[in-house]
Each structure stands twice: as C-alpha cells, then as structure tokens.
C-alpha cells in the first residue's frame, strides 16, 4: 500500500526558526554546546547522585527555555542500562498528515520508576534529543518519505539496522562495505538515496552521542572501575561499531548514486 503523506511538526515539538536556520556545522556546534550545558547543569543538580525524573525534567526544560518542548520520559525495558529515543507521532488518515508531536525518551529506571539507573545513558539519549531538535526538517523529511514508500520499509529498516549494529570480529570493513553495497543496490535509486540520507543522519547523531558519553565517562573517573568502564566503551565504539568508517562509506555511496541520478535527469531533458 502506498500513501501520499505530508508532514507537520507541531509547535511544541520544535525550536523556533531562528534557532535552526544556521548551516549544519553551526547547528552541530550549538548542539554540542547544549550537551555540555546539560551535563554541567544536571551534574550540579544531582550532587547527591540521585538522578530523579523531576530533576532531569527541570534541567531539560531549562536547556530549551523559553521554548517549551513536548517530551516524555519512559522506562526502557529492553535490557539493563540501555536507552533509546523515539518520535511521538500521530497520523490523520483522512487528511494524510503525519504529525510530529514530540519526543519520547526511554531510560533505564530503577525499580521505583522515579530515578535513572545509569546517568551516562541519560547523557547519550539527551544528546540525541538535542540533535533531533536542531535538525527537525531532516528528521521529518526522512520519516515522511519512508512512510510514502511503505513497500520498501522492511528492506530499508533492515539496511538501517545493519549499519547500526556492531561489526563482528570475523567481519572487516571491506566485507561490510560489500554486503552493505549489495543491499542498497537492491533498492530503486530514489529509495536508496533516501535510505542513505537517513542512515547518514543516524550515524552522525550516534557519533555525537557516543563521543559525548565517552568524554563524560572519562571526565568522571574516580576509581579503577570507572576507568575500565570508560575504556571498554571507547574500545567497543572504535573497534566494533566503526561509525566513522560507516559514515565515510555511506557518503561515498550516496555521492555516487546522486551523480547517477543527476546524469539520468540530464539525459531526460537533453
């Protein structure tokens, strides 16, 4: 089934235009500054080590003030210490409008459901939230097109997950690039371009979030266990996820497809 969905970002799910009209590099720089600001504020707010939802909400609200962002904080039930972020979406099927109503943060909560169990997962997911708010049009454009191309959703979802998963010790980047290229080549060129653009955005925000989490872990080292945890995450990020290498490949593949698309369009009008 195919749709012709248009998207609409609701007022409380975005920042005003003056906050996001800069170039990508400038927006990314501001997002990094906001992440540092949140880290400093929440660390100061939670000097007793209790990262309660009420304190987290206070710091997030202050971070984006005077703008009011609609978001929820939920318990992540998948596995200990894991976290995730999702869109709060609603669809008006009659008008065929996809509404982006806000952001849902999923964090590892303690049994009392009022405190975060791992503050570094919090830092990681809040960086995702910041990145999404400073790149709202990119985010909605990707969602919009993927819904309109529902017939390929299983394939595009699989490819996206393939890029985000750890690379097995038995698999090197050369093998990854070949398998990824084979998967992308199955798609029609326009869908492949859209998928790679989504993957590129996803990889960039993962690089940002992991870089922040690693930096804050090393900054907070108080004993040998803290050092080992920070080092293990850094090694896993560099050796297993290889997000920077994947981003280079995605950009190269995307550029090649865009070149083919431009040549095809030129040929049509010659």
What is each residue range found by the language model?
Residues 130, 134, 217-220:
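Sec/Tat-exported extracytoplasmic proteins
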Residues 76-119, 126-133:
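Active-site scaffold of zinc-dependent metalloenzymes
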Residues 177-201, 206-270:
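Pan-zinc metallopeptidase signature
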Residues 117, 125, 150, 206, ...:
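Acidic-residue sensor for enzyme active/binding pockets
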Residues 116, 132-186, 194:
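Post-HEXXH active-site segment of zinc metalloproteases
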Residues 1-14, 18, 209, 267-270:
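Non-Sec secretion/translocation targeting segments of pathogen effectors
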Residues 27, 34, 43-68:
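Zn2+-dependent metallopeptidase catalytic core
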């Amino acid at each position: 089934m195919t749709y012709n969905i248009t998207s609409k970002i609701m007022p409380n799910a975005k920042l005003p235009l003056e906050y996001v009209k800069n170039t990508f590099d400038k927006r990314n720089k501001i997002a990094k500054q906001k992440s540092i600001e949140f880290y400093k504020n929440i660390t100061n707010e939670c000097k007793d080590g209790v990262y309660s939802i009420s304190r987290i909400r206070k710091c997030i609200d202050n971070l984006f003030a005077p703008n009011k962002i609609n978001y929820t904080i939920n318990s992540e039930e998948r596995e200990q210490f894991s976290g995730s972020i999702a869109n709060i979406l609603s669809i008006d099927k009659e008008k065929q409008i996809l509404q982006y109503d806000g952001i849902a943060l999923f964090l590892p909560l303690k049994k009392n459901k009022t405190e975060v169990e791992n503050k570094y997962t919090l830092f990681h997911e809040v960086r995702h939230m910041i990145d999404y708010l400073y790149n709202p049009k990119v985010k909605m454009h990707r969602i919009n097109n993927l819904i309109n191309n529902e017939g390929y959703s299983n394939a595009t979802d699989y490819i996206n997950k393939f890029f985000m998963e750890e690379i097995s010790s038995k698999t090197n980047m050369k093998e990854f690039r070949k398998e990824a290229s084979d998967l992308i080549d199955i798609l029609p060129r326009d869908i492949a371009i859209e998928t790679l653009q989504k993957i590129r955005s996803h990889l960039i925000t993962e690089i940002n979030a992991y870089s922040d989490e690693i930096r804050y872990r090393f900054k907070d080292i108080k004993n040998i266990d803290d050092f080992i945890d920070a080092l293990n995450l850094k090694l896993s990020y560099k050796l297993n996820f290889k997000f920077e290498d994947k981003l280079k490949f995605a950009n190269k593949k995307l550029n090649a497809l865009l070149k083919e698309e431009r040549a095809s369009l030129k040929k049509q009008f010659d």
